[in-house]
Amino acid sequence: MTMDALKRQAAARALEYVEDGMRLGLGTGSTAKHFVELLGERVRDGLKVVGVPTSEATRADAERCGVPLTTLDDLDRLDLTVDGADEIDPDLNLTKGGGGALLREKIVAAASDRMIVIADETKWVAGLGRFPLPIEVIPFGLAATRRAITEVFAKAGVSGELAVRKRPDGHAFVTDGGHWIFDAHLGQIPDASYLAGLLNPIPGVVEHGLFIGLARVAMLAGAEGIRIVERR
């Protein structure tokens, strides 16, 4: 089975948790895109839901698939968010943001009663850090922000390259919110929760890709089927 087929399998399983009348957070990325497409099929069959997209790309996908949309300006709470992840550890802490939508993804996840993360089995890791950690920053004062982040890394017992994310044309990648992203190549992160707490107050840091305590359920697709892991 191809990797894409595994992602779609995980998305289909998550769809079983969607009920009529739900307010849904719609994630960003290749796996979340499968969920949006399958949700659109259910909507065409009569399912009544409304979704809040976590990126402009997801908004476009949802509109193409006929999924009704709203915003968190109109809803202050969501029933369920379904999103992918770049890494998932045994406590269901996540690394997210490979697609650049980490800020909106975290806002939507935090506004949800439940978050289901869907992925293929390669995203399951013993500890976070193998995938570069995205850190969304304001372009102003970039050197000072970089220095502050590096100091925090030393305090958290990690180190590694901190690189501005680039587009294929060599220019800086710009998020939907108009920010830039540092990708931190750290290797193993000894304590992801501790690092997250140190990054949060840095002036210039808008958000980071450590999602601590937000996911309730992970659905991991592999050659032998779907493995469901619930947060301990």
From Swiss-Prot:
<comment type="function">
    <text>Catalyzes the reversible conversion of ribose-5-phosphate to ribulose 5-phosphate.</text>
</comment>
<dbReference type="Pfam" id="PF06026">
    <property type="entry name" value="Rib_5-P_isom_A"/>
</dbReference>
<feature type="binding site">
    <location>
        <begin position="28"/>
        <end position="31"/>
    </location>
    <ligand>
        <name>substrate</name>
    </ligand>
</feature>
<comment type="pathway">
    <text>Carbohydrate degradation; pentose phosphate pathway; D-ribose 5-phosphate from D-ribulose 5-phosphate (non-oxidative stage): step 1/1.</text>
</comment>
<dbReference type="InterPro" id="IPR004788">
    <property type="entry name" value="Ribose5P_isomerase_type_A"/>
</dbReference>
<dbReference type="InterPro" id="IPR020672">
    <property type="entry name" value="Ribose5P_isomerase_typA_subgr"/>
</dbReference>
<comment type="subunit">
    <text>Homodimer.</text>
</comment>
<feature type="binding site">
    <location>
        <begin position="96"/>
        <end position="99"/>
    </location>
    <ligand>
        <name>substrate</name>
    </ligand>
</feature>
<dbReference type="GO" id="GO:0009052">
    <property type="term" value="P:pentose-phosphate shunt, non-oxidative branch"/>
</dbReference>
<dbReference type="InterPro" id="IPR037171">
    <property type="entry name" value="NagB/RpiA_transferase-like"/>
</dbReference>
<feature type="binding site">
    <location>
        <position position="123"/>
    </location>
    <ligand>
        <name>substrate</name>
    </ligand>
</feature>
<dbReference type="GO" id="GO:0004751">
    <property type="term" value="F:ribose-5-phosphate isomerase activity"/>
</dbReference>
<comment type="similarity">
    <text>Belongs to the ribose 5-phosphate isomerase family.</text>
</comment>
<feature type="binding site">
    <location>
        <begin position="83"/>
        <end position="86"/>
    </location>
    <ligand>
        <name>substrate</name>
    </ligand>
</feature>
<dbReference type="InterPro" id="IPR050262">
    <property type="entry name" value="Ribose-5P_isomerase"/>
</dbReference>
<keyword id="KW-0413">Isomerase</keyword>
<protein>
    <recommendedName>
        <fullName>Ribose-5-phosphate isomerase A</fullName>
        <ecNumber>5.3.1.6</ecNumber>
    </recommendedName>
</protein>
<feature type="active site" description="Proton acceptor">
    <location>
        <position position="105"/>
    </location>
</feature>
